Amino acid sequence: MAKNKQSVFEEKNYTQTEPENIFGDLYDGKSTVEEDPNIKVAYDADGNGYYIAFNKETGVYYDPYGDTEYDISQLFDENGNPFVFDEKQEENDYLKYVGNPDYGSYDENGEWVWSGYFENDQWISTKESQPTDENYGFDSDLPPEVKQPESVEDNYGFDNDLPPEVKQPESVEDNYGFDNDLPPEVKQPESVVDQPSSDDYFAKQPTDENYGFDNDLPPEVKQPESVVDQPSSDDHFAKQPESTTDSYSFDSDLPQPTLDQPSLDDHVQYNFDHHEELKPVAEEQNNYQVGFDQVQANLDNNEEIQPTAEKKVTTDFESKQAQVVDSYQLPIDTDQQDQTTFSSSFETQPTVEQFDQVNSEVNDQFKPEITKEPVLESSFNKQDVVETSDLNSESNLYSENNKDATNNDSLNSEFIQLNSNSETASDDVHYESKSEPIHDYKFGSDLSQSNSNNSLESEPVKFNSETAPDAHFESQSEPVDQVQYDIYQNEELKPTLDQPSSDDYFAKQPTDENYGFDNDLPPEVKQPESVVDQPSSDDHFAKQPESTTDSYSFDSDLPQPTLDQPSLDDHVQYNFDHHEELKPVAEEQNNYQVGFDQVQANLDNNEEIQPTAEKEVTTDFESKQAQVVDSYQLPIDTDQQDQTTFSSSFETQPTVEQFDQVNSEVNDQFKPEITKEPVLESSFNKQDVVETSNYTNNLQKFDIQSDNKITITTKKSSPQIPTTLPISFVSNRIEYKPVETLALDNKESQQEQITINSITEDSKTLAKTLSVQLQQINSLNNQSIVTSESVRLDKKDDQLTINTVNSEDQQPKIEVFVKAKEPVEEHSITQNKQSVEDKSELDNFNKKSDLYKIISELKRGELNPTINFDAIFQMNDYQMSVKQSFIHLNDFVTNYKNQISERYLIIKKELQSELSRLIDQNENLNVQFNNAKNLTTLQKEEMIRSLASDFAIAYKPSNSYEQLQKSGEIMRHVQRAITENEKKIESIQGSLKQLKTVYNSCCETIMNNINKLDNTLRFAKKEKDPLLLSNFDSVTDNGLVEPNQLMDDLIDFSNTFDNISNEQLDDFIYENMDRNIDFEFEGFNNDFVDIDAKVMDSMSAFSVNDLDIETLVPDRTSNFSSLLDEDLFESSGDFSLDY
C-alpha cells in the first residue's frame, strides 16, 4: 500500500517546539541546583545571554564553559545597566547579628524578626525610637564595624561632616532631640526651683542649654575619635541629681558637637556674667526650621525661667564671642608650660572661659566674681533668615551663613597653628575690638568683633596656603627653638574693665582668644578633621566656674600668623620691638583681593589706632634704608641670642609677592649679621615691576647702594696686602699684563682691590670685564667661584671696585655694591631679566678668557700638558654635538619613513577596498540590468498578444503598458549607476597609480638622506685623527690656528670622499684599522653602516655642504633599533585587480 506523500513529508515547525518536548525535562525539581556565585550572566545589546566568570590572576573575563574571552564593557545586566562583575558576598555576613536586640527580636514563635535592613553593609533601622534604658538613643552597643547611615532630616545637618562609620541613625520626627521620652528616674523638673549660688551652680552641673553633651568628661571616660560608643545623656542626667534648673537634653540621635562645627549654639545662646546666675534665655522664634518652635513656646510661657538679662541675643548667632563661645578645646599636653595668649578687654566681661581638659587648674589668685548678666535680645526674620544681634559687651564671630558653614568641609579642615613649633608667649596681647558683619568672605561666614571702644577691628581670615597674603595682625609669641622676642607691656592700650592678666594665670590654662584650637596639642592627642565625640561644654563650665575672661573662638579654617611663612601680614602687622609693645596698626587698603574692602574701610575710619612703626615705607620699596621692610625670615638657630625686630607699615596697599619655598630676611638695624643660613631677601616694585634682590649667603653678598660703583670684596682672616691688576682694552679684546708681585701667602693678610674706570667702554664691555676680574681673582686664590650676574652701567664715569677678602674657612665672600647717581632701579642687578643674547655673549667671552689664560701660560714658557685635541679646539664637544645631531636626524628620518609608509598603506588599502566594492556593485547592477531587460522583453510580448486578441476580457493592455514603462525606467536607472561606477573605478585606479609614483619619490628622497647621513657619519669617524694629527705640529709650533682655516681643511678633507662608494669606504676603514681609529659609534647599530648599495644606485653623489635636510625637526621619542626596514618598502609594491 503506497503511503501518502503528506504522511511521509509531514510539515512540522520544529523551531517552535519547546526543548523539553525534544530532549525531555532535564530538571525534575527534586534536587536543589546550587548556584555558582563565581558565574554571572550578562547580555549584549541584542539581548543574548552569556555566562561570565572572572580570572583574578589574569584579570580576564571568560566563558566558564569554554575558552571565549569577553569584554564586559560591551555587556549589560538584566536591567539594561552596564554589567559589573561583583562576586557574591558571604551568605552568613549578617548572621552574626542574629540575637542582638539592636537588630531585631524573636517573635512569639521563636523566629528572628529584623528591626531594619542592611544597605551596602550599613544598618538602617525601621524601628521607632523607644526609651529602653539609660543608654537609649546611643549606639554604644553597636559593634565598630557596623556603619551608621546619615541622618535625613532629624539631625538638622549637624553630622554632615562626620565619617561614615560614626554616622547617626535616623531619628524619629516627633522626638525633636529633646528628652521627652526619658525614663522617669532621670526626668528633669519642668520648672525652676530656687537656683543655687553661682559658684555652686557652675561647679555642680553644666548649663542647661547645652546640657547632655560630654565635652568635659574625665579622661578615663573619654571616648576615642572614631568610636561609635559614647556616654548617653541619660547617664549624664542621672549623675547630677542636685540640679533643679530646668534642663534641656537633646535626643541621642542628634549629632554631638565636634571641634569644627557649631552644634546647638546656633539656636540657644549662652550668656554668663560675672555676678549673676545663669538662666535660660527666651527667644522669639517662629516656625524655626529645625522644629524648635514648641520648645521655645514652652520657654516663653514659663514665667519662672524668664531671663534676668536686660538685652537679648538674636537667633542668627553671628557672634561666636557671646558669653559662651561655641568652641571646644581638646586636651593639651601637660608638659606644655607656656601657651600663646590672646586676651581682650571690653566694657563688660560677660563670658566664662573654657579651660583645658588636662591642665584645668585655675590660679586661685584670679577668681573673679560673677556680677551681672547682660540683657539678651533675640529676633528672627522669617523671610530672609537674616538675624541681628545687639551685644555691646560681646564680640560676634558667627555669620549669617554659619548654618551653611557647619555643613562645609572647610570647617573641618586642620588648624593652622599660630607658630609651627607650638610657639608660646609669656605676655598677653590686649585687644580692643569692634567689628561689623562682613559678607564677602570666601568661606561664607561673617567674622566680626564688636566693642563699644571702637578701637580696633580685626578679623581672622582664611587664606590660600600658597599665596597667603599678609594681614595687619599684631601677635607676640615666644617660639620654641627660635629667636625669642621680649615684648614689654604697652601702656597705651588699657583694658576697659579690670581683668586678670597674670603670667601665671595664662601659663596654666588656655586663653579665650585661642580657645578651640589644638595648636599646642601633642601628636598623640591630635584630633582628625572630623571628630565625633567631643566633650560637652556644659561639663566644661561645671568644672571651671572661676574664669570670667572674655573668650574668642576663631573659625577652624582661619590660619594663624606664623613666623615662618607670609601668612596674615597684609592685614596684621608684626612689630616686635625691644622697648615698645604691640599695637594694632591701621592700614589703607581698598578692594583687597580676598574681600577685605569692608574691613579695611572700617579700619580707615578708625582714628584711635595709629601704627607704631616710626617710619613709613612706600610700596615700591625703592629704599632699603627704611626701618620697615616687607620681608620674612627663616628660622634661626637657638644659639642665636640676639633679638630681632620685626616692624612694617605701609602708606598704600602693598603688592602681595608670592614665594616659592623662598623666605626673605628682615633688613633690621637691631639684628646682627647672620651668616649661618643662606637667606634671600626680595622686595617687589609695584610701579615698574622691576625686581631687585639682595643675596646673602656664605659665599656672596650683593648689596645695592646709591652710586654707580661696583665693589666686589672677598675677605680672609690673614693680614691684608693690596694688589692692583691693570687691564687694557684694545679693539674690544682684553689682555692681561702679568704682574710679578702676585705672590699670595695664606698666612698673610690679602686684600685685592681692582679699580676700573670705564671711560669709553659700553655696558656690555663692563659686564664682561666684571666676569673676567672675578675669574682672575678666583684663579689667583685657587678658588672656583664663578658669578653669572650681569651688571649694567650706562654712565661713562662709573667706577668698578673689586675687594676680595677670604674668610677663615678659605671661602671667599664677594660683595658687589652699585653706587648710582641715578635711581637705584636703573642701575641695579636685576634677576631673571637678562636677555638670551647677553648670556650667550658672556659665555663666549668666558670661553675666550680661558683661551687667553692658556696663551699667557704658553708665553711664560710653562709646559702645559693641557694642550691637546680637546683643550684648545674643544673637538670633543664638537664630536658630541655632531653625534647628537646625527642621532636626532636619523631618528627623525626613520620615524618619517615609517610614517609615510603607514599613510601610504592606509590610503592604498582604503582605495582598494572601494574599488572592490564598486566592482561588486557593478556586477550586481549588471545582473539587475539583464533581469530588467528580460522582463521588458516579456512585457512587450504580452502586450502584443493582448493587442492580437482583440482586447479580450482576460487581458488588460493598460496594466501591461504601465509595467513596461516601469521596467524601462529600471533599466535606465541601472545603466546610469553602472556608468557612474565605472567612472569612479577609473578615477580610483588613476589615483592609486599616482599615489604609488609619489610614494616612490618620497622613499627615494628619504633613502638619499639616509645615504648622506651614513656617509657623513663615516667622515666624522675618520676625520678625528687623520686631519688633526697632520695639523698638530703647526698648532704647537706656529701658535693658534684660525678656526676658519680649520674648517676649510676639514671640508677639503671630506670632499675627497664625495664620490667614493660604500664598498670603497669600507676598504678605507679596513686599511686604517692598524692606526687604532675608533670606528664604533655610540647610539647606532650595524644596520646603519651596512646599507645595501643596490638601494642607492639611483642616488647622485653629494658633498658635505649640500645636506638639504636641515629643516627637518628631530623626533627624540622613536626607537631607531632597525633604521632600514627594507621589507616595509618591498611590501608596498604594485597591486593588481581582476575585474
From Swiss-Prot:
Residues 902-935, 974-1025 form a coiled coil. Its main location: membrane. Pfam families: EAGR_box (PF16713). Transmembrane segments: none annotated. Residues 128-266, 369-570 are annotated as: Disordered. Residues 389-400, 445-458 have a biased composition (Low complexity). It comes from the Bacteria. It is found in: Cell projection, Attachment organelle membrane. Residues 427-443 have a biased composition (Basic and acidic residues). GO terms for cellular component: attachment organelle membrane; cell projection; plasma membrane. Component of the cytoskeleton-like structure which stabilizes the shape of the wall-less Mycoplasma. This cytoskeleton-like network of accessory proteins containing HMW proteins 1 to 5 allows the proper anchoring of cytadhesin proteins in the mycoplasmal membrane at the attachment organelle. NCBIfam families: EAGR_box, termin_org_HMW1. This is Cytadherence high molecular weight protein 1. It comes from Mycoplasma genitalium (strain ATCC 33530 / DSM 19775 / NCTC 10195 / G37) (Mycoplasmoides genitalium).
